Amino acid sequence: MSHGPSPRLAESPQLSKGSLLTILGSPSPERMGPADSLPPTPPSGTPSPGPPPALPLPPAPALLADGDWESREELRLRELEEARARAAQMEKTMRRWSDCTANWREKWSKVRAERNRAREEVRQLRQRLDALTKELAGARRERQEAQGECEARGRELARLRGARGVADQTRDGPEPEAEREPVRDVGSERPPGSQELELVESLLKSMPEESEDCWEARSLGAGGPRGSSGRQERSRLPWEDTAATEEEASKLTALRLRLDESQKVLLKEREDKLALSRNIEKLEGELSQWKIKYEELSKTKQEMLKQLSILKEAHQDELGRMSEDLEDELGARSSMDRKMAELRGEMERLQAENAAEWGRRERLETEKLGLERENKKLRAQVGDLEEALARRRRQTASALDCDLRASQAALFEKNKELADLKHVHGKLKKQFQEKVAELAHANRRVEQHEAEVKKLRLRVEELKKELAQAEDELDEAHNQARKLQRSLDEQTEQSENLQVQLEHLQSRLRRQQQNAPLFGKIRSARFGTEEAEDGTSDLDEDEDLQIQVA
């Protein structure tokens, strides 16, 4: 619907007198009614000297419309300034929100970097622990190998001693003779091989002297009063002497063979003894090396325990810092919740203001409709005035000019008022459009704020989930550290048990080394008593000396 003026009213100020007369000359019968309300004119053709009749004035709301519109414009401008201030405040709050989110991101990046650092340290500790466990396993294997070698050496020693005892028993079995006296440890400073050789040589030297003494004693005992019997015996003596010399020669050859065998056995036993001494020295060197390695392992273990304690302290410090950061974040989260509540209140207030703006808009529309109705009334009044002027022009030709001028002036004023009203209406329309655009912009901003608030809520939930994951990972790291500590304690206990076993083996080896000469002495004493009871020869002393050497 167009609200512009009608062309008849728009062109009314430019109408000439003739046109007005023609218009007034042909009045319509429908508009003749209101002429009765006009004052009567004089019957003569001359106009009355009095003032022209008063024209009907517009209603009071039309006169007071300008003041109302100015006050309304001031109110609208004030509301516009308030809306702009609110929009600036909202922008400031959104900037603060963006700064808060940036700070949160920085804090979470720091927390993630610290978490990655802690994971890297835990991984390095695991690698070091694996390397230490491998070294401990290698040390255990080497220790077990050393124990196996020690046991094998012990078995070899026992086997050699058993073989030597069996050889001694086999040597002692076929000989019927026994020693006269048990051999004692005389001249222990000399080597046992030289003592045995000297004993065998003395035995060989004493045997021919004894045979010569026996021969002289026999020859002296034969010279008696019985000469005939002596002569008979002299014929027997060469045969007996030859038999005795043959027996003694066979005994000497047997003794020499036994001497050679005993020398060979002594050489073999010396070589075995040297090899055993070398093996024992080698084992002692290996034991010293194992002791050094064990000390190094204990030192490395102490260092690892120190490092673990340092890492535990650092981890506890980091946990304290992380708990403080979490408390700060909880405080920031509570402040963010408060800000969210404030923003919600502000959004509700903006929604209420938006509703009020919509109410104002409806009121403006109603006022606009009222103005349009007033315009229609004014147009109707203008039409009535024109009809009244036409009737008066028809009634009084003399007062036509005055009435025409007055009506033209009134029409001009009315047109002027209508133009002012149109101008004000255009301004109000522009302001209304601006308000509508601002309201649409405010609605878009509110929707953007709501979307950003939703994004922030989602981000807060994601941060909560990441925080829970970080706490779970920290708990897993604690559990793994406890497991590693438990495994380290078990390994230390196993290493202590192995050390105790190694000390027991060393003490057993020392006892065996100390008991070896005592065992030889006991053997020699036992064999000496048995030979003294049997009355054996000096050849068994050689065997006792061999047993003592063993």
From Swiss-Prot:
Coiled coil feature spans: 72-161, 263-396, 427-518
Modification Phosphoserine, positions: 12, 26, 28, 537
Compositional bias ranges of the Acidic residues kind: 530-550
Residue segments, region Disordered: 1-69, 138-247, 472-497, 509-550
Record field: compositional bias (Pro residues): 37-61
Cellular-component GO terms for this entry: myosin complex
Pfam families the record matches: Myosin_tail_1
InterPro entries: Myosin_tail
Biased composition annotated in UniProt, kind: Basic and acidic residues: 138-159, 169-188
UniProtKB keywords: Coiled coil, Phosphoprotein
Superkingdom of source: Eukaryota
Listed PANTHER family: COILED-COIL DOMAIN-CONTAINING PROTEIN 102A (PTHR46292:SF3)
Listed name of the protein: Coiled-coil domain-containing protein 102A
Taxonomic source organism: Homo sapiens (Human)
